[in-house]
UniProtKB/Swiss-Prot annotation:
Comment, domains: The coiled-coil region is essential for oligomerization and binding to vacuolar structures.
GO cellular component: early phagosome; endosome membrane; lysosomal membrane; membrane; membrane raft; phagocytic vesicle; plasma membrane; vacuole
Chain intervals with Polar residues compositional bias: 1-30
Disulfide bonds: none
Organism: Dictyostelium discoideum
Topology in membrane: Peripheral membrane protein
Function in brief: Negative regulator of late steps of the endocytic pathway.
Gene3D superfamilies documented for this protein: Band 7 domain
Descriptive protein name: Vacuolin-B
Compartments reported by the entry: Endosome membrane; Lysosome membrane
Length: 592
């Protein structure tokens, strides 16, 4: 037998064609194998094809080599003349025949061929037909070729034991080999693959699976690698309410899951799990490692969860109301929905209490009261303390019951109000049972005497009218005050803006005057420097002084009328400049 095992034994050489050592020798084991306690893997139970990655030409050669191994006398011939001629086949087909039930494959490669003719009556040679090289399964008389598609497994039987083949071609020489092509191929991604005693289980993310191995329960968490079991006593627990693959799995986020003696618990923040280990109370808080708590003991029982976060209850509770109806079918709605007490001034009042509490020590609370007795105890002691307080108080005192939290001086023996009388006693009582009182309030209070109730209602209406009127007056006062404040602020803003404008204008004028003065100073300084430079220049070059003096004189004579007498004409013509100097000097003397 060449291939047919649930556990493969690989040899060192896998490449030489026709070598006996490269073939996966098959040996099957029953489910009671020696290594039953060890975890199995896919590679241990699935037979891999050792030539799946070869070329198609090489795969065909390997199939022919292995299929025809040990055949001495062939049933085929390349010359149809020497035998029984067969129709020409496509290159993608094998021809198959047998000699005395020894099956043989032949690859004609598109050429003419035939089967051998034998005159020996003891020799039977029969042509079995053609098969495609890609055919998923073919074979006869104990020789088989199995081409497993990509992404699939093939489930077969050998020696009445299951065997699974991986993708790729396989050549099996085994007279006990059985394979049904209709049901034998299975997708590798199937969450649960069952083949007789072989079981492959893939638990998806966010799911868990419940299984039995004989009488041993297992809860399998999600993981990347599949779980593999080879055991005839393996059994999956299915959920009959689900269909498809969902019936095999449960949500991993379930707070509690039980399977045989295994308990899988996930307490959430704000609660703890109640368990009893051999009858002893065991509290399980939320795990800090983020993993579920697994208990594997038939005598360790799970009772439930109890909240440790803040709880708020309305009393009378629903159960108390139902019991009141059961005790008195003619009870009125007030008698059912309210707890009735009598005040010190003999008035009947009905109340509804709001109690907020937190269980700070679950072990003490459960040990002393039990899970179902906690709420009942809180309700009973709340009404008991409230009843005592109401009996010692008048209706008016009760109406001013406003404080809702335990008094800061609750340990003080001197109490002055109904709040202290109720809350201090209740807080001390609950503390002994591992319970912390967070809030106590009368949610509803009703005076059952109709006449008193009407008077109180009238007082309430009058008080409401006065309150409304007072609120209106206060509102009007606030409006007028706001308007006056807005007007004053507006006027202040206007004055402030006007003052800023005047200051800005004066500042601008001051800056302008300063700049003009600076300009005059700069101009005078410049003129002074120019005159000093001209003086230095005229001193160094006198001719320039004379030229400048001539310019001044010419400017002075531009608009003047000069009268020259005949006796001065000769002097003027000889030296005009000298004549003009004398004339100007004479004129200046006359002016003096």
């Amino acid at each position: 037998m060449i291939e047919s095992s649930s556990f493969m034994k690989k040899t060192s050489s896998e490449n030489s064609i026709g070598s006996r050592s490269n073939i996966h020798e098959a040996s099957t084991f029953s489910s009671e194998h020696e290594n039953g306690d060890q975890s199995l893997t896919i590679s241990q139970i699935v037979i891999r094809s050792d030539f799946a990655n070869e070329t198609s030409e090489r795969q065909s050669k390997i199939i022919l080599e292995r299929f025809n191994e040990g055949i001495k006398n062939t049933a085929f011939t390349d010359s149809p003349v020497l035998g029984r001629a067969q129709p020409r086949l496509d290159v993608s087909y094998f021809a198959m025949a047998h000699r005395n039930q020894i099956v043989e494959l032949f690859d004609p490669r598109g050429q003419r061929f035939g089967t051998v003719y034998s005159a020996d009556p003891t020799v039977e040679i029969r042509y079995l037909g053609s098969v495609a090289k890609t055919c998923r399964y073919f074979g006869s008389f104990g020789k088989h070729v199995l081409n497993v598609p990509s992404g699939h497994f093939a489930k077969a039987m050998t020696k009445n034991r299951p065997i699974i083949y991986g993708e790729g071609p396989h050549v099996i020489i085994d007279p006990t080999f059985e394979f049904d092509e209709r049901y034998g191929f299975v997708n590798q991604q199937e969450p649960f693959i069952n083949h007789s005693t072989i079981n492959i289980l893939r638990v998806p993310s966010g799911k868990v699976a419940k299984v039995w191995i004989g009488t041993q329960p297992l809860i399998l968490e999600s993981r990347r690698e599949p779980y593999v079991f080879v055991d005839a006593q393996f059994k999956m627990v299915e959920d009959t309410s689900e269909s498809g693959n969902n019936k095999y799995f449960k949500n991993s986020s379930a707070t509690f899951m039980e399977h045989g003696s295994i308990k899988r618990i996930i307490p959430h923040t704000g609660e703890v799990a109640i368990t009893y280990n051999n009858g002893i109370l065991t509290i399980i808080p939320p795990p800090k490692d983020g993993k579920p708590v697994i208990i594997d003991s038939p005598t360790h029982n799970f009772e439930g969860f109890i909240q440790t976060s803040l709880q708020t209850c309305l009393f009378p509770s629903k159960e108390t109301k139902q019991q009141a109806i059961k005790d008195n079918k003619n009870a009125t709605s007030d008698e059912v929905n309210l707890k009735i007490f009598q005040t010190r001034d003999s008035l009947r009042v009905g109340v509804v209490l709001v109690v907020a509490f937190r269980i700070v020590d679950p072990e003490i609370a459960l040990t002393k009261l039990g899970k179902e007795g906690i709420i009942n105890h809180i309700e009973n002691v709340s009404f008991a303390d409230m009843g005592k307080a109401i009996q010692l108080s008048t209706l008016q005192e009760i109406m001013y019951f406003n404080d809702t939290k335990p008094s800061a001086n609750s340990t003080n023996e001197t109490v002055h109000t109904i709040q202290d009388r109720v809350k201090s006693h209740l807080a001390r009582d609950l503390c002994e049972y591992g319970i912390e009182l967070a809030r106590l309030q009368i949610e509803t209070m009703k005076v059952l005497d109709s006449e008193i109730a009407k008077k109180l209602a009238g007082q309430s209406v009058t008080s409401a009218e006065f309150t409304t009127k007072q609120a209106t007056l206060v509102k009007e006062y606030d409006i007028k005050t706001t308007e006056a404040r807005l007007k004053a602020e507006t006027d202040n803003i206007a004055l402030e803006q006007k003052g800023k404008a005047i200051i800005a204008e004066a500042q601008a004028k001051l800056e302008s005057a300063q700049k003009q003065a600076q300009a005059l100073l700069i101009t005078a300084e410049a003129q002074k420097k120019v005159q000093e430079m001209q003086g230095e220049l005229f001193t160094k070059y006198p001719i320039l002084a004379e030229i400048e003096l001539a310019k001044i004189k010419s400017e002075a004579l531009k608009s003047a009328t000069l009268y020259i007498t005949p006796q001065d004409a000769g002097n003027f013509m000889n030296s005009p400049l000298v004549y003009m100097d004398r004339l100007l000097g004479h004129q200046q003397k006359l002016e003096k």
